[in-house]
C-alpha cells in the first residue's frame, strides 16, 4: 500500500504565525481550520497493509519514530502530521488519528 507523509511547512509564515505546528486537532480547529495547502510532502513509500486502517497508521507511526528510513529528512512523526492513504489524509492527533475529510476519529 502506498502512503505519503505530509508535515506543516515551517517556512510558511501563516503556519508559524498561526502556531499550527504540533497542535491537536481540536485546538487547531477551534482557532483556525485544517488547510492541506500549508503542508509539504516529506516522504512517499509503501507498507504492507495491516488488517485494519488503524493498525496500518500505527505501523507507519512506529516506523517514523523508531526506524526512520535513511532517505527521510522530516522530523519524527508527531501531532499535526498527516499520513495519506488511498487519497485520504489522516491527521496525527494526541492519542488517535483524525480523517481530515470528515473530522472523525479512526
Where in the sequence are the language-model features?
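N-terminal disorder-to-order initiation segments that are Gly/Lys/Arg-biased
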Residues: 1-43
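Weak global preference for isoleucine
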Residues: 5, 15-16, 27, 36, ...
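Short, compact, well-ordered microdomains
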Residues: 73-106
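Short, conserved turn/kink motifs that form compact alpha/beta structural patches or helix kinks used as
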Residues: 27-84
